[in-house]
Amino acid sequence: MKRLLLLLFAAAATACGGPYGAGIPAGYEPLLDAALADTPRADSLRALLRETPRDERAAMAWLIAWMPRGDRDTMSLDLLRENVRYACCAREEFPWTKALPDSVFLNEVLPYAVVDEVRDAWRRDLYERLAPRVAGCRELAAALDTVNRILPAVVGVEYNTLREKTNQSPAESMRQGMASCTGLSVLLVDALRAVGIPARFAGTAAWHDNRGNHSWTEVWIDGAWHFTEYYQPWALDRAWYLADAGQAVAGDRNHAIYAVSFHPTGDWFPMVWSEQSRDVHAVDVTQRYVDTYEAFASDAERQGTHVKVALRMFRDRRHASQSGDRVAANVDVFRDGEQMGGGRTAGPLQDMNDVLSFLLEKNSSYLFRYENARGELTELTVEVGDEPLTVDAYME
């Protein structure tokens, strides 16, 4: 009889799925044990797991196991519940999400946060705005193109340095109608995740010439990561910063390119708005950008479609011959309103052969934009033909 009772107890425990309920992989249990041992809300989180529908419970368990301690201690459980429900709904609804490996879905679709922004209820809102727009798409690429193209109009948010803060949440950006490149990237990542497209935040603390930082978005498509940004470039992996990214330095905390991960990686993302923080996990993806730019430059040279354009910045027309006459200035390049590149000109102490150069498409008109010595926006129109070109610009 005792043996029979033990067998019945074991069967009942198996049916219930252990201490956290059915549907949770056995490998998650030690992770949950460790996570819940270190939070005052352990009982509430255990109850949340047991109350979560069985087909959503593994996703909830994964988030609780890996969420930052601060979120585990304070984040709204209703918000966590809604996030999991709509992420799992997207996986059931969209064929591209259903086809994802579990590891990609869990780390690049399911998470409720991108970096260290305020945790708000973005997923349901963005799902309801965007799901009807991608309902007719059969492939991830088409859904990605749709969301990337229409998002600025759908949410009414534009780039503006007057935004309240750098690391804005979607709700904060939509309330103001503006965001920095960081806020725009957070918004695009969340918009893509809302309709089941795997996405993550990427960026660098400083370009190779130290003229500033930048953030953008990576998307997982056809088994590989590619980059885009809030204002959709003409193709994946062809944004205006490609040449700069191609000169990033792997392993250099300031000049490498990192992509964020919700799951711990052993490395961290250098957030310029919170320089002491080590809380956001990341991977160094610099080499992929270097390889992408080298392939682009090699193809352009082989096909003869692009030409090198060098830009020198001098004090004025009377002082434009000696190394000491040169001025270091940030310059952006546009064609038909779309940014094609940017960089910083060589200053007076740099070698005379060190010249800011761009690889630009032939037979096109370009606008070079910079601030002069008086802080005024200056624009220089340059007609690029078939031959390499050196352009001189002046601060006065």
Language-model features: where?
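Positively charged n-region of N-terminal signal peptides that target proteins for export
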Residues: 1-4
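Sec-dependent N-terminal signal peptides
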Residues: 6-9
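C-terminal motif of bacterial Sec signal peptides marking the signal peptidase cleavage site
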Residues: 14-15
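A eukaryotic "domain-start" boundary segment
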Residues: 20-39, 43-47
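Secondary-structure boundary elements
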Residues: 43-47, 51-176, 212, 266
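His-Asp-centered catalytic microenvironments across diverse enzyme cores
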Residues: 160-161, 194, 205-210, 215, ...
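Cysteine-centered nucleophilic/redox motifs
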Residues: 177-202, 217
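Structured interaction patches on ligand/partner-binding surfaces of diverse proteins
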Residues: 371-396
